[in-house]
A protein has these predicted regions:
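A recurrent flexible, glycine/aromatic-enriched loop bordering the glycosyltransferase active site
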Residues: 90-97, 114-133
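Active-site-proximal specificity loops/subdomain of glycosyltransferases
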Residues: 1-45
């Protein structure tokens, strides 16, 4: 395996070279990091599958990665993409505020306003659309347009809906309990925390 040090001198040099050609993502963050990771996977052409998961998971268990990979690496299955989900309850309270209070009601409102569509049905079918855990078969990577901000999870789902049949897409229950570092609400600053996440 390879570790990409996104703030290290080698990747910073590559980033500058790509920026000079207007090819590099211009926003720092998860989307940019994923863009470089997937780019390296495509360039090396050695991995059959790639999985991504958030790095701030407090309840991490290595079985999560195995569960995430299994549907896309098992040759018996025809899945190109797997999205993880898990309960968003920890310390006797409901988490997943952006998914619960913005994304789910927004999808319902859109459906009531513009009517049902394959896209809205697809997005509503995911138990936790903002999960940062997903895996792909390698051939999927060159088809993806990657968002460089907090919108990466919704963007990846949109790309999968655009490029693949629902029969090639699955969801997997990753954990009985899941907790991660929570973002501040940031009511007074839309460039941070949940405010930025919701806008993106």
């Amino acid at each position: 395996f390879t570790i990409l040090w996104n703030d290290g001198p080698r990747l910073q040099k590559l980033d500058e070279e790509l920026k000079e050609k207007s090819l590099a993502p211009n926003q720092l963050g998860k989307g940019r990091n994923v863009w470089y990771c997937l780019g390296m996977s495509i360039a090396r052409d050695t991995a059959r599958s790639v999985a991504l998961h958030d790095c701030d998971i407090k309840t991490y268990d290595r079985r999560m990665l195995a569960k995430l990979f299994y549907p896309v690496v098992n040759p018996v299955f025809n899945f190109e993409f797997c999205k993880g989900f898990y309960p968003r309850i920890a310390n006797e309270k409901m988490n997943g505020r952006v998914a619960r209070l913005l994304v789910a009601p927004l999808l319902i409102a859109l459906e009531k306003t513009i009517g049902s569509s394959e896209y809205l049905q697809f997005m509503k079918s995911f138990k936790y659309p903002l999960s940062g855990e997903f895996s792909f078969r390698r051939n999927v990577l060159s088809e993806l347009r990657i968002s460089s901000d907090w919108g990466i999870e919704v963007g990846v789902l949109s790309e999968m809906q655009r490029n693949f049949s629902p029969n090639n897409i699955c969801q997997v229950d990753l954990a009985d309990t899941y907790d991660h570092k929570h973002q501040d609400l940031s009511l007074d600053d839309e460039t941070k925390g949940l405010s930025k996440m919701s806008i993106d």
